[in-house]
């Protein structure tokens, strides 16, 4: 019976450590506005975000910044 309980305990520890490793691997997401001065071109935005930050670029309207739509880059911090 003691060997069986020890085996269950070992399996439980392994499963728990696997969950902890998955949480650390996900990371946090960061957002950065690229080139606020010019209007956003979706293809240029995606290319600069991917090449500079290995992220995904999207055009969006920012109420804090006057003018045309901006390029936003979402990437893993």
Swiss-Prot record:
Record-level GO BP terms: defense response to fungus; killing of cells of another organism
Per UniProt, the keywords (alphabetical) are:
Antimicrobial, Disulfide bond, Fungicide, Plant defense, Secreted, Signal
All disulfide bonds of the chain are 30-77, 40-59, 45-71, 49-73
Q: Which domain of life is it from?
A: Eukaryota
Q: Which InterPro entries match?
A: DEFL
Q: Span of the secretion signal?
A: 1-27
Q: Where does this protein reside within or beyond the cell?
A: Secreted
- Pfam families reported in the protein's UniProt record: SLR1-BP
Q: Which GO terms describe its cellular component?
A: extracellular region
* Keyword Signal recorded: yes
What's the family? Belongs to the DEFL family.
Instruction: State the protein's name.
Output: Defensin-like protein 159
> Native species of this protein?
Arabidopsis thaliana (Mouse-ear cress)
Lineage of origin: Eukaryota, Viridiplantae, Streptophyta, Embryophyta, Tracheophyta
Please state the gene responsible for encoding this protein. LCR25
């Amino acid at each position: 019976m003691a060997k069986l309980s020890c085996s269950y305990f070992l399996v439980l520890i392994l499963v728990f450590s696997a969950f902890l490793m998955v949480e650390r691997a996900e990371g946090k997401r960061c957002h950065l506005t690229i080139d606020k001065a010019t209007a956003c071109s979706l293809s240029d935005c995606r290319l600069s975000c991917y090449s500079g930050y290995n992220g995904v670029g999207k055009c969006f309207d920012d109420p804090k910044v006057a003018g045309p739509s901006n390029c936003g880059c979402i990437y893993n911090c």
